[in-house]
Amino acid sequence: MTKKVYVKTFGCQMNEYDSDKMVDVLNAAEGLEKTDTPEDADIILFNTCSVREKAQEKVFSDLGRVRELKEAKPGLLIGVGGCVASQEGASIVSRAPYVDLVFGPQTLHRLPQMIDQRRASGRAQVDISFPEIEKFDHLPPARVEGPSAFVSIMEGCSKYCSYCVVPYTRGDEVSRPLDDVLTEVAGLADQGVREVTLLGQNVNAYRGALTAGSTEIADFATLIEYVADIPGIERIRYTTSHPKEFTQRLIDTYAKVPKLVSHLHLPVQHGSDRILMAMKRGYTVLEYKSVIRKLRAIRPDLSLSTDMIVGFPGETEEDFDKMMALVHEMSYDTSFSFIYSPRPGTPAANLHDDTPREVKLKRLQHLQATIEENVARISRSMVGKVERILVEGPSRKDPNELSGRTENNRVVNFPAPLASHPRLIGQMIDVKINHAYPHSLRGELLLVSDDASAATH
C-alpha cells in the first residue's frame, strides 16, 4: 500500500512552494503520495508561519489534535517545518514531545535523512541550520497539476524591518543562479504550465549568478526578460517586492515585457512617514507613490494590492488618517491587513504601545471596509468588458463550469460545454464579464471551437 504524507501550510506563498517541495522530496525518496486527510497519513507535516502570534499558536493547537492520531497509529511521524521551527527549534519537542521532526525552510530537502535518523535512533530530529541555497541543489524536478506554478528565485531577507522575524527565521538574502531558475521554469512549461509566479521575500533584491560559480550577475529585471523568452510561458507574476528596491530598470520592464501582468503586490505597510521610519522600511510615502505613478504611466490599468499594519506602537489618529488617505489615493484592489503583533526578538517588540486594542480593532475594521469597497467597485467596473483569462480547471461551485483568473487575479467562472473542458484547461481565452460578486466574477466564453488552439484567439 502506498504511504501518504499530509502537509498543512500556514502563511505566505513561499510556504506554499516549500510545502509542495516537501511532498516532491518525500515522493522521490520514499514514494509517498500527498493526501488531504491527516487520518490517512503516515507522515504529518506542519509548514509554519511566525509573522503573527495567532498563526504561531495555531500550530500548537493543531499539534494537540494530531497527537490522538499518533496514539492510535504508533508508526505515524509528525514534523514541524517553516519559520516557527526556525524560531523555536528544539523547544517545540519540549512543548510537544510527540513531535518527531523539526526543520527550517532551508533544510526541508534533508527530510528523508531526518526520517531515517528518527527511525534508527528513536529520538526526535532537529535541523534548523541555514545552509544558504543548498536545498535547491537537492530538490527533485517539480511535479505540477494545472497551468500555474510558483518558482522560488531566492531565499531570506536582509532588510531587517523593526517588526519582522523573517531575517531571523529564513536568513539573509541569497539568490539562485539564473540558469537554475530558468531550467525550473522551462521544465514547468514542458508540463503545461502557462503562468509562473516568481517568489521571494524581496524579489527586487534578486542578484543571481548567470551560472553556478559565475561572477556575472543578473538582476530581477533581467530574470523576468529571460523567463518571458521561455516557450509556453504566457504570464509572469511575482511576489513579494519591496518599494525601496523598485528600480527604474524594473519599472521599464513593464514596457518591455507584455507577459508581465498588469497586477502588482507592493507592500506599503503604512501611510505615515513617521511610522514607516519606526518600522525601518527605508522609504517615504512620496517615494512609494512615485513608483506607482511611473508604473501607471506605462500601464494605466495596473491593479495594485498591498500589506498594511494597523496599530504599530505609537500610531496616532493622525497617522491612521494618513494611511486611509493613501488607500483612497492608490485605489488598492486588495490589502492583507492586520493589527500589529509584536514578535519576540525584534526591535519593535520593545517599543511602548499605549493604544487600546479596541481602538486598533476599530481602525482595522475601517481600513478593511474601505478596501472591500474598492474591490467591489473595481469588480463592477469589469462588467461588460472582455477579459483575457487563464483557464485553471472546473469551477469549485459547479463542476459543469470552468474557472480561470484575470490579470488582476479575479476568479472568473463561466459555462462551457463539458466536451470542451479538457482542451480549454490551460488555455488563454477571452471571456465577457456579465456579473460581479463579492469574491468572483461570472462571464461567458466568446468562442468555442472544435480546434483547441482556436480557444486562445
UniProtKB/Swiss-Prot annotation:
First-listed, main subcellular location of the protein, grouped into a coarse class: cytoplasm
Instruction: State the Pfam families in the record.
Output: Radical_SAM, TRAM, UPF0004
Query: Which Gene3D superfamilies does the protein's record reference?
Result: Methylthiotransferase, N-terminal domain (3.40.50.12160), tm_1862 like domain (3.80.30.20)
Q: Which PROSITE patterns match?
A: MTTASE_N, MTTASE_RADICAL, RADICAL_SAM, TRAM
Catalysed reaction equations from the record: N(6)-dimethylallyladenosine(37) in tRNA + (sulfur carrier)-SH + AH2 + 2 S-adenosyl-L-methionine = 2-methylsulfanyl-N(6)-dimethylallyladenosine(37) in tRNA + (sulfur carrier)-H + 5'-deoxyadenosine + L-methionine + A + S-adenosyl-L-homocysteine + 2 H(+)
Q: Where is the Radical SAM core domain?
A: 143-377
* MTTase N-terminal domain ranges (all copies): 3-120
Cite the EC number.
2.8.4.3
- The TRAM domain covers which part of the protein? 380-447
User: What is the annotated localization of this protein?
Assistant: Cytoplasm
Q: Which domain of life is it from?
A: Bacteria
Q: List, alphabetically, the SUPFAM superfamilies matched.
A: Radical SAM enzymes
- What cofactor does this one take? [4Fe-4S] cluster
A GO molecular function held by the record: N6-isopentenyladenosine methylthiotransferase activity
Name the positions where [4Fe-4S] cluster 1 binds.
Answer: 12, 49, 83
Keywords of the record, alphabetical order, are: 4Fe-4S, Cytoplasm, Iron, Iron-sulfur, Metal-binding, S-adenosyl-L-methionine, Transferase, tRNA processing
Q: Where are the transmembrane segments?
A: none
This entry carries the following GO cellular component terms, namely:
cytosol
PANTHER family xrefs: CDK5 REGULATORY SUBUNIT-ASSOCIATED PROTEIN 1 (PTHR43020), MITOCHONDRIAL TRNA METHYLTHIOTRANSFERASE CDK5RAP1 (PTHR43020:SF2)
Q: What does this protein do?
A: Catalyzes the methylthiolation of N6-(dimethylallyl)adenosine (i(6)A), leading to the formation of 2-methylthio-N6-(dimethylallyl)adenosine (ms(2)i(6)A) at position 37 in tRNAs that read codons beginning with uridine.
Q: How does it assemble?
A: Monomer.
Protein name per the record: tRNA-2-methylthio-N(6)-dimethylallyladenosine synthase
Whichever gene encodes this chain, its name is miaB
